[in-house]
UniProtKB/Swiss-Prot annotation:
<keyword id="KW-0963">Cytoplasm</keyword>
<dbReference type="InterPro" id="IPR035246">
    <property type="entry name" value="Spermidine_synt_N"/>
</dbReference>
<feature type="binding site">
    <location>
        <position position="184"/>
    </location>
    <ligand>
        <name>S-methyl-5'-thioadenosine</name>
    </ligand>
</feature>
<keyword id="KW-0745">Spermidine biosynthesis</keyword>
<dbReference type="InterPro" id="IPR030374">
    <property type="entry name" value="PABS"/>
</dbReference>
<keyword id="KW-0808">Transferase</keyword>
<feature type="active site" description="Proton acceptor">
    <location>
        <position position="176"/>
    </location>
</feature>
<feature type="binding site">
    <location>
        <begin position="157"/>
        <end position="158"/>
    </location>
    <ligand>
        <name>S-methyl-5'-thioadenosine</name>
    </ligand>
</feature>
<protein>
    <recommendedName>
        <fullName>Polyamine aminopropyltransferase 2</fullName>
        <ecNumber>2.5.1.16</ecNumber>
    </recommendedName>
</protein>
<dbReference type="GO" id="GO:0008295">
    <property type="term" value="P:spermidine biosynthetic process"/>
</dbReference>
<dbReference type="GO" id="GO:0005737">
    <property type="term" value="C:cytoplasm"/>
</dbReference>
<comment type="pathway">
    <text>Amine and polyamine biosynthesis; spermidine biosynthesis; spermidine from putrescine: step 1/1.</text>
</comment>
<keyword id="KW-0620">Polyamine biosynthesis</keyword>
<dbReference type="Pfam" id="PF17284">
    <property type="entry name" value="Spermine_synt_N"/>
</dbReference>
<dbReference type="GO" id="GO:0010487">
    <property type="term" value="F:thermospermine synthase activity"/>
</dbReference>
<comment type="similarity">
    <text>Belongs to the spermidine/spermine synthase family.</text>
</comment>
<feature type="binding site">
    <location>
        <position position="108"/>
    </location>
    <ligand>
        <name>spermidine</name>
    </ligand>
</feature>
Length: 297
């Protein structure tokens, strides 16, 4: 159950600006339109303050086990596969032979799960600033193959990792950091980050970036901001979008290409996907008129 309430309505039991109320029956998430989205809580799994952010894992009546970071919903067990399949597979299929993959933002490890479905993959480096998020998600939200022999995890600020990286170039990079422009991932949403990322890619490479909400007024600034930055660095930047049920929003992504000139799929779709297929791949790149107008495409 999700309720949308104006600020100040029913807040007497809320201990802070967001999160669980004192009864532990509802979780309050600030809505960018000025109100709140309120979720009915079935059980509280863990509340934890890391060095970087507040981590809440709760079981919601509607969405099941869900991850909140600093009061913002990140993922639910009911539909995480929609988000992660949309994030990973368009970029992976475009590259002719993705062997080395960089994942910026490991989180629950679901992107690692999707990447390893491609037999060409030899190495995955996953970078996340918050080791505790990764550990708690593995414990409470289901194991993912982050301990596969092809996977190496680095717990560091993503921008610092990119800046200091001197290893073999990457074929695919997946940028899946939190969508606020002022939180732990603020160093990623910068022109210098993507310029340096471009330098550590191979001659032929694909990059996918989660582009935040398409229509919500505040986060839309991030959507346009990211697109403008990517256009300054990559010769081809293609936006796409789809509806994420638990977000109650149209969510955007960008594929950026280096040394590849089109989105022609070069790999078959992995067999065990739940959402993404050929029809979906065609549909998501057909943006609604308001989005095309905002991006000038």
């Amino acid at each position: 159950m999700i309720l949308k309430l104006e600020v100040g309505v029913g807040l007497k039991n809320l201990n802070g600006k967001w999160g669980l109320d004192s009864s532990k029956e509802f979780y309050w998430e600030p809505d960018v339109e000025g109100g709140y989205r309120v979720y009915k809580v079935k059980s509280v799994i863990i509340e934890h303050q890391s060095l970087y952010q507040k981590i809440d894992i709760v079981e919601l009546e509607t969405w099941g086990k869900s991850l909140f970071l600093d009061g913002s919903l990140q993922s639910t067990e009911s539909d995480e596969f929609i988000y992660h399949e949309l994030l990973v597979h368009p970029a992976m299929r475009v590259h002719p032979s993705p062997k080395r993959v960089l994942i910026c933002g490991v989180g629950e490890g679901k992107s690692v799960r999707e990447v390893l479905k491609y037999p060409t993959v030899k190495e995955v480096i996953g970078v996340d600033i918050d080791k505790e998020v990764v550990a708690l998600c593995q414990k409470h939200l289901g194991k993912t193959p982050i301990d596969d022999k092809r996977v190496r995890l680095v717990y560091q600020d993503v921008a610092e990792f990119i800046k200091n990286y001197r290893g073999e170039p990457f074929d695919v990079a997946i940028v899946d950091v939190t969508d606020d422009l002022d939180g732990p991932a603020r160093s990623v949403h910068q022109l210098d980050f993507y310029k340096r990322l471009y330098e550590i890619l191979g001659e032929k490479a694909t990059v996918v970036v989660q582009g935040t909400s398409a229509f919500s007024k505040v986060k839309n600034v991030g959507f346009c901001h990211i697109y403008e930055i990517l256009k300054e660095v990559f010769p081809f930047v293609i936006p796409y979008a789809d509806y994420i049920p638990s977000f109650s929003d149209l969510w955007t992504f960008f594929v950026a290409l280096k040394g590849i000139k089109d989105l022609t799929p070069r790999h078959e779709i992995p067999r065990d996907l739940k959402y993404y297929d050929e029809y979906t791949n065609e549909r998501i790149f057909t943006l609604a008129k308001p989005l095309r107008e905002k991006l000038g495409v």
